[in-house]
Amino acid sequence: MAQIPARGDCSRQLTRKQAGDAWEAAARRWLESKGLRFIAANVRERGGEIDLIMRDGKTTVFVEVRYRRSGLYGGAAASVTHSKQHKLLHTARLWLARQNGSFDTVDCRFDVLAFTGNEIEWFRDAFNDHS
C-alpha cells in the first residue's frame, strides 16, 4: 500500500463535493505519476458518473475514486458495491458508444483507487463486464 503525503484532513473543512473533487485530483496526479494518461474527469451519462477516464498504453481505464477516513466498516474499496459496479459499467458503455466504440472493440478495464486514511490502494481490473 502506498502512503499519501500528510496534509491534514482537508475533507473536514470542505463540502462533500469539494472534498470529492480534491480526492479525484489527487487520484489523477497519482495515476499520472504511475504512467497513465488523463482522458476525462467526471463523465456523466444517463444513470451514472465516472470519476476518471485514463489511458494505460492502449487500454482505456475507467477509474472509481473512493475515500474513507478509516478502515472501519471495510474501508474505501469496500464501498464499491455490485450496484455501483453495474452503474459504472452502464455509464462506460454509453461513453464508449459516444466515442464509436464498445466493450467488444476497445480494450478497457475498471480500476478502483481507494484512499483510506493516508493509504492508497490501487485495484487494477477490480471488476469487468463479465463479473
From Swiss-Prot:
UniProt cross-references to InterPro entries, sorted A to Z: Restrct_endonuc-II-like, tRNA_endonuc-like_dom_sf, UPF0102_YraN-like
Pfam families: UPF0102 (PF02021)
Cited SUPFAM superfamilies: Restriction endonuclease-like
Domain of life: Bacteria
GO function term, MF aspect, one: nucleic acid binding
NCBIfam families on file: PRK12497.1-3, YraN family protein
Family: Belongs to the UPF0102 family.
HAMAP family according to UniProt: UPF0102
Name by which UniProt lists this protein: UPF0102 protein YraN
